[in-house]
Amino acid sequence: MLQQAERILQEVLDAFDFGGQVAGVLRYGQGHINDTFCVYVQQADGDAKRSILQRINTDTFRDPAGLMENIVGVTEYLRRVIQEKGGDPERETLTVIRTKKGEAFFTDSTGGAWRAYHFVKDTVCLQQVQTPEQFYQSAWAFGNFQRLLADYPAHTLHETIPKFHDTRDRYKKFEKALEADVCGRAVEVQAEIRFVREHQADCAVLMDLLESGKLPLRVTHNDTKLNNVLLDKKTGCGLCVIDL
């Protein structure tokens, strides 16, 4: 099993253009959905160039091609906007590393889907907030992400997990799960169940506004947590939104 995993990893490393000979690979980060690795490439000056390699969880994201088309579209748009505003697109948004065949992701011989990004240097990714300012900076980064993408043609994005944001559908599934009560735990959370049912109408508000045209379709991140923002190591300022 270990030999097969090493063979697949080597197959993946050979597929991407990391800009040199790979010197090492280590598991990286504390993500729960995708498997993340840091790839080290030795450079002529002795420094090690780093890249991020991820195996996409295709049980969660069953359309990796659509997912990566979304990410490439959004990040390339962000690069243009950031540059126009005098920013540094190499640090302020993700940069997709393409395969040697020019593709945005690679499918290995077992069907696994892989993607790679440039490593954003001189940043920190916090798992736990230490100061109110850090929370502010993470919120600022997500707000800036939304602002920069305000004019992005959101209708061109693929819905990679169908009805994931459809709160009316979520409520229907809640009622089905409640009726099935497969673990027999509903009796322990009657107050919470009552609260949700009392607010059933709220579940339709955003979807109704969207369908009526009163709420414009926009790009959203939808996993706006502290460890999905890179902070500048020197200034502590919110720099780059990740895990798109």
What are these language model-derived features?
Residues 227-230:
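Catalytic-loop signature of eukaryotic-like protein kinases
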Residues 224:
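Hydrophobic HxD+1 residue recognition
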Residues 44-72, 76-156:
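ATP-binding pocket architecture of kinase catalytic cores
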Residues 243:
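Conserved active-site aspartate in kinases
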Residues 1-3, 19, 26-30, 54-65, ...:
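ATP-dependent phospho-/nucleotidyl transfer catalytic cores
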Residues 18-44:
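ATP-binding glycine-rich phosphate-binding loop
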Residues 40-50, 235-238:
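Active-site beta-strand-loop-beta-strand hairpin of nuclease catalytic cores
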Residues 1-26, 74, 78:
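Juxta-kinase regulatory segment immediately upstream of eukaryotic protein kinase catalytic domains
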